[in-house]
C-alpha cells in the first residue's frame, strides 16, 4: 500500500469519526432540549385561560348590503341622469 493510499484511508476514517461524533452530539442535544422543555412545562405550566366576560347587549347587526342599498340606488340614479 502506498503512502498516498494510506493517507487517504486515514482521512476517510477521521472524516467518518468526526461526522459520527457530530451526529451523536446533535442527537444528545435534541434529547436534552426535549427533556428541559418537558421539565419546564411540568414545573411551570401555562395558566388556564380566563373565562371571557359575557358581552353587553350589543346593537343589532346590520349587514353591509342593507346599509349600502340606498347608496347604490343613488349612484345608479345619478349615472342614468348624467348619461340620459
Swiss-Prot record:
GO terms for biological process: sodium ion export across plasma membrane. The chain crosses the membrane at residues 13-33. Pfam families: OAD_gamma. One of its GO terms (cellular component) is plasma membrane. Keywords: Cell membrane, Ion transport, Membrane, Sodium, Sodium transport, Translocase, Transmembrane, Transmembrane helix, Transport. The keyword Transmembrane helix applies. It is found in: Cell membrane. Its cofactor is Na(+). Its EC number is 7.2.4.2. One of its GO terms (molecular function) is sodium ion transmembrane transporter activity. It catalyses: oxaloacetate + 2 Na(+)(in) + H(+) = pyruvate + 2 Na(+)(out) + CO2. It is a single-pass membrane protein. NCBIfam families: oadG_fam (TIGR01195), PRK02919.1 (NF002792). Catalyzes the decarboxylation of oxaloacetate coupled to Na(+) translocation. Heterotrimer of an alpha, a beta and a gamma subunit. Belongs to the OadG family. This is Oxaloacetate decarboxylase gamma chain 2. The gene is oadG2.
